[in-house]
Amino acid sequence: MRWVKYTLFFLNNFLLLVNAQDFSVGTWRDHLPYSEFNQIVEVGNFFYAASPYSLLEFDNSNNEITKLSTVNGLSEIGISCIAANNSHQSLLIAYNSSNLDLIKNGEITNISTIFNSSIIGDKSIYSLYSHSKYIYACTGFGIVVIDIERKEIKDTYILGNNNS
Protein backbone atom coordinates (compact mmCIF):
# COMPACT_ATOMS: atom_id res chain seq x y z
CA MET A 1 0.00 0.00 0.00
CA ARG A 2 2.89 2.30 0.80
CA TRP A 3 4.45 1.88 -2.66
CA VAL A 4 1.12 2.93 -4.26
CA LYS A 5 1.26 6.27 -2.39
CA TYR A 6 4.85 6.88 -3.51
CA THR A 7 4.03 5.94 -7.09
CA LEU A 8 1.03 8.25 -7.20
CA PHE A 9 3.07 11.06 -5.62
CA PHE A 10 5.89 10.80 -8.18
CA LEU A 11 3.49 10.32 -11.08
CA ASN A 12 1.54 13.43 -10.04
CA ASN A 13 4.73 15.53 -9.78
CA PHE A 14 5.96 14.23 -13.14
CA LEU A 15 2.70 15.20 -14.86
CA LEU A 16 2.91 18.71 -13.40
CA LEU A 17 6.39 19.19 -14.85
CA VAL A 18 5.59 18.02 -18.38
CA ASN A 19 4.69 20.72 -20.91
CA ALA A 20 1.41 20.09 -22.68
CA GLN A 21 1.69 22.86 -25.27
CA ASP A 22 4.39 24.00 -27.66
CA PHE A 23 3.54 27.67 -27.11
CA SER A 24 3.44 29.84 -24.01
CA VAL A 25 0.47 31.30 -22.19
CA GLY A 26 -0.81 34.53 -23.76
CA THR A 27 0.22 33.65 -27.32
CA TRP A 28 -1.99 32.58 -30.18
CA ARG A 29 -1.59 30.27 -33.13
CA ASP A 30 -3.83 29.57 -36.07
CA HIS A 31 -5.39 26.39 -37.40
CA LEU A 32 -6.28 27.66 -40.85
CA PRO A 33 -6.17 25.54 -44.01
CA TYR A 34 -2.96 26.15 -45.96
CA SER A 35 -3.60 23.69 -48.77
CA GLU A 36 -5.61 25.72 -51.28
CA PHE A 37 -4.40 28.97 -52.85
CA ASN A 38 -6.08 31.04 -55.54
CA GLN A 39 -3.44 33.65 -56.40
CA ILE A 40 0.33 34.13 -56.23
CA VAL A 41 2.37 37.32 -56.81
CA GLU A 42 6.03 38.34 -56.58
CA VAL A 43 7.26 41.42 -54.70
CA GLY A 44 11.05 41.74 -54.83
CA ASN A 45 12.56 38.64 -53.17
CA PHE A 46 9.20 37.60 -51.74
CA PHE A 47 6.40 35.49 -53.16
CA TYR A 48 2.92 35.82 -51.66
CA ALA A 49 0.29 33.11 -52.03
CA ALA A 50 -3.29 34.00 -51.09
CA SER A 51 -5.89 31.57 -49.83
CA PRO A 52 -9.39 32.61 -48.81
CA TYR A 53 -8.29 32.52 -45.16
CA SER A 54 -4.66 33.57 -45.00
CA LEU A 55 -1.48 34.53 -46.82
CA LEU A 56 1.84 32.71 -47.16
CA GLU A 57 5.02 34.73 -47.58
CA PHE A 58 7.99 32.93 -49.14
CA ASP A 59 11.37 34.65 -48.82
CA ASN A 60 13.36 33.58 -51.89
CA SER A 61 16.69 34.69 -50.39
CA ASN A 62 16.64 32.24 -47.46
CA ASN A 63 13.77 29.84 -48.38
CA GLU A 64 11.78 30.84 -45.29
CA ILE A 65 7.98 30.57 -45.22
CA THR A 66 5.89 32.83 -42.99
CA LYS A 67 2.17 32.41 -42.38
CA LEU A 68 0.25 35.68 -42.27
CA SER A 69 -3.24 35.72 -40.78
CA THR A 70 -5.30 37.65 -38.26
CA VAL A 71 -3.08 36.14 -35.54
CA ASN A 72 -0.03 38.12 -36.69
CA GLY A 73 -1.27 41.30 -38.30
CA LEU A 74 -3.82 40.89 -41.09
CA SER A 75 -7.11 42.70 -40.51
CA GLU A 76 -9.46 39.91 -41.53
CA ILE A 77 -9.96 36.57 -43.20
CA GLY A 78 -11.76 36.21 -46.50
CA ILE A 79 -9.14 37.40 -49.00
CA SER A 80 -10.73 38.11 -52.38
CA CYS A 81 -7.59 39.14 -54.32
CA ILE A 82 -4.05 40.51 -53.99
CA ALA A 83 -1.86 42.77 -56.14
CA ALA A 84 1.86 43.46 -56.16
CA ASN A 85 3.34 46.90 -56.75
CA ASN A 86 6.99 46.22 -57.57
CA SER A 87 7.95 49.88 -58.03
CA HIS A 88 7.17 50.46 -54.33
CA GLN A 89 7.90 46.90 -53.08
CA SER A 90 4.41 46.56 -51.62
CA LEU A 91 1.44 44.20 -51.63
CA LEU A 92 -2.23 45.14 -51.44
CA ILE A 93 -4.71 42.63 -50.00
CA ALA A 94 -8.44 43.02 -50.70
CA TYR A 95 -10.97 41.24 -48.50
CA ASN A 96 -14.52 40.11 -49.26
CA SER A 97 -15.78 42.84 -46.91
CA SER A 98 -14.07 45.54 -49.06
CA ASN A 99 -11.42 46.16 -46.42
CA LEU A 100 -7.80 46.58 -47.61
CA ASP A 101 -4.38 45.82 -46.09
CA LEU A 102 -1.11 47.16 -47.48
CA ILE A 103 2.15 45.33 -46.73
CA LYS A 104 5.28 47.41 -47.26
CA ASN A 105 8.70 46.67 -45.72
CA GLY A 106 7.13 44.11 -43.38
CA GLU A 107 4.64 46.63 -41.99
CA ILE A 108 0.91 45.97 -42.39
CA THR A 109 -1.30 49.06 -42.77
CA ASN A 110 -5.09 48.88 -42.92
CA ILE A 111 -6.94 51.07 -45.44
CA SER A 112 -10.59 50.87 -44.43
CA THR A 113 -12.01 53.75 -46.49
CA ILE A 114 -14.16 51.60 -48.80
CA PHE A 115 -15.24 49.37 -45.90
CA ASN A 116 -16.33 52.39 -43.81
CA SER A 117 -17.91 54.35 -46.69
CA SER A 118 -21.65 54.97 -46.78
CA ILE A 119 -22.01 53.83 -50.40
CA ILE A 120 -25.24 51.92 -50.88
CA GLY A 121 -24.89 48.81 -52.98
CA ASP A 122 -22.15 46.36 -53.82
CA LYS A 123 -18.80 47.40 -52.33
CA SER A 124 -17.07 44.11 -53.15
CA ILE A 125 -13.58 44.27 -54.66
CA TYR A 126 -13.41 41.96 -57.67
CA SER A 127 -9.89 42.56 -58.99
CA LEU A 128 -6.80 44.71 -58.52
CA TYR A 129 -4.44 46.17 -61.14
CA SER A 130 -1.10 47.82 -60.34
CA HIS A 131 0.46 50.61 -62.40
CA SER A 132 3.15 53.08 -61.34
CA LYS A 133 2.45 54.25 -57.78
CA TYR A 134 -1.24 53.34 -57.91
CA ILE A 135 -3.33 50.21 -57.58
CA TYR A 136 -6.71 50.27 -59.28
CA ALA A 137 -9.52 48.33 -57.59
CA CYS A 138 -12.46 47.12 -59.64
CA THR A 139 -15.45 47.23 -57.28
CA GLY A 140 -19.18 46.71 -57.50
CA PHE A 141 -19.77 50.47 -57.75
CA GLY A 142 -16.85 51.53 -59.95
CA ILE A 143 -13.09 51.99 -59.93
CA VAL A 144 -11.09 53.08 -56.89
CA VAL A 145 -7.55 54.45 -57.24
CA ILE A 146 -5.28 53.66 -54.27
CA ASP A 147 -2.09 55.70 -53.77
CA ILE A 148 0.57 53.31 -52.45
CA GLU A 149 3.01 56.04 -51.33
CA ARG A 150 0.43 57.93 -49.27
CA LYS A 151 -1.50 54.79 -48.22
CA GLU A 152 -4.87 56.34 -49.08
CA ILE A 153 -7.66 56.44 -51.65
CA LYS A 154 -6.71 58.98 -54.33
CA ASP A 155 -9.83 58.92 -56.49
CA THR A 156 -13.11 57.09 -57.10
CA TYR A 157 -14.91 56.67 -60.41
CA ILE A 158 -18.54 55.67 -59.87
CA LEU A 159 -19.86 53.86 -62.92
CA GLY A 160 -23.45 53.10 -63.78
CA ASN A 161 -26.67 54.48 -65.23
CA ASN A 162 -26.94 57.69 -63.20
CA ASN A 163 -23.22 58.34 -62.71
CA SER A 164 -21.89 57.33 -66.13
Residue ranges and their predicted role:
Residues 1-7:
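Bacterial N-terminal signal peptides that target proteins for export
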Residues 7-15:
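Bacterial N-terminal signal peptides
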Residues 16-20:
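Sec/Tat signal peptide C-region and signal peptidase I cleavage site
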Residues 22-43, 69-87, 112-131, 156-164:
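Short coil-to-beta transitions that initiate beta-strands within beta-rich domains
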Residues 46-49, 90-93, 134-137:
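Conserved beta-propeller blade signature
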Residues 50-70:
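Beta-propeller domains
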Residues 53-56, 96-100, 141-144:
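Loop/turn residues immediately N-terminal
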Residues 59-63, 104-107, 147-151:
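Short loop/turn segments that connect beta-strands within beta-propeller blades
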